[in-house]
Amino acid sequence: MAPVEIAASLQAVRTALDPRAIAVLGASDELTKWGGSMLALLRKFGFRGAVYPVNPRADLVQGMKAWPSVQAIGQPVDVALIAVPQQRTEAAFEDCAAAGVKVILMVTSQFAESGAEGAALQDRLLAIARRAGMRIIGPNCMGYFNSHADMSLLNSQALMRNDRLIKGEVALISQSGALAGAMLARAYDLGVGFSFCVSLGNQADLEVCDFLEHAIDDAHSRVIALYVEGVKDGARFVDLLRRARAAGKPVLIVKAGRTALGQQAVQSHTASLAGEFRAFESQVRHAGAVLVDDFLELVAQAAAWTRLPAPSGRRGPTWCAPGTRSTASPSCTASIRLRWPRPTNCHPRPR
């Protein structure tokens, strides 16, 4: 990707995470609907910008004036959340393009992940966006939040149960919205807060690397946690991992699609090409990232990195109970190339 394209993508990420005005297409009084719950969360956490509910069949939504279209608002809109059925997304994109929207967050599904017909519609939406200079997060995602802007467009039960966004130093970037929600719930149980969290879904436009690069440059983010199904630009991804290591920001990764069956599941989930796991593992470890097995370990390690100083090297002692734990520890730590110094001047203590 050319530097000018990367710069444009990073500007779009910054706009998405710190918008001045948001339109909610599909806004509803019903909290069981996406347009209802996400509008409620925007208000609940005290977003300081302008919020415009868009619903042509209502005058008021959640006590706020509703607009028949984005164009009818007549004011600049940075981000438009599209929470309408798939068959209405093309008209919604044309409306946003005519209104000069900068970034679209599309939570609607049934696009490239569902087959050729959905992929063709996704391509048409991307063409509309490119003609208008709009950028897309999604589709088939669950949204995002930025705790330091008190702004949430993430549909999550963990957020619905909390009175505030817990500010923290972990940037969470996930292709899976469901796993992002599960990690968020577990992290909140541990008292771990996030700088920002984003669910990317199909990555039709903005992708993992764009948000990873933003996290490296973001003063609020000290630890970066990733759930990755497929990477669009492998060379850029590995280069960013090296940059994160040089910046002193640990990158923790859960990688889906480790087996052939897992790769098929990934394709049907977010239309990602998972790639061969061993090659991925070798490259990311060499670049300084930490691969973990599941989202519970990802949250636990992120919590540890925010609370403990980074080690200065690979040498370090391990304390454990006698027996199996002590004999298994060297094998477990060998995968991360931890070296155990031999103890000196040690004497058994009589019992």
Where are these regions (language model features)?
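Catalytic-core regions of core metabolic enzymes
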Residues: M1-P311, R315
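Residue-level recognition of specific faces of alpha-helices
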Residues: A50, V103, A328-S329, R339-R342
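Internal amphipathic alpha-helical segments of the cytochrome P450 catalytic fold
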Residues: A180, G234, S326-T327, R337, ...
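Short acidic, glycine/serine/threonine-rich helix-capping segments at coil-helix boundaries
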Residues: R342-R351
